[in-house]
Amino acid sequence: MKSQGAAKNEANNAAQETKPVEKIDFSKVKVEPLFEEMVDFDTFSKSDFRAVKVKACEAVKKSEKLLQFTLDDGTGIDRTILSGIHAYYEPEELVGKTLIAITNLPPRAMMGIDSCGMLLSAIHEEEGEEKLHLLMVDDHIPAGAKLY
């Protein structure tokens, strides 16, 4: 068992070895205003937010915007979700990532393909240009983990 002093020294050394946090300047970033309409808790609670792992991702033929994701949602059955984010991401850079999806939306056909859910992203404007970032979480979170 380590002495309390030795444990403190190790903690201090580990803290000194970590890289300083890079500060990001958000002063030129514009975000959409918050919704004024309230959603009751029961309605919100019906949405099933899950961690999903990207098994495959490809551009949808004849579409400039759509990417087709093949996802592991923890059920053992692949889930397909389409997302109009090709302007922001190349398909190959998303394979292996852990994303957040709403999994209990009814299927919606796009370009003849059923999309079974929605991937969550954040959108803002920076220097007059729209930016989009998929919500990605730590890869240690297993596919199918429920978010509360």
Question: Where in this protein do the model-derived segments appear?
Answer:
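Phosphate-backbone binding interfaces of nucleic-acid-interacting proteins
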Residues: 1-148
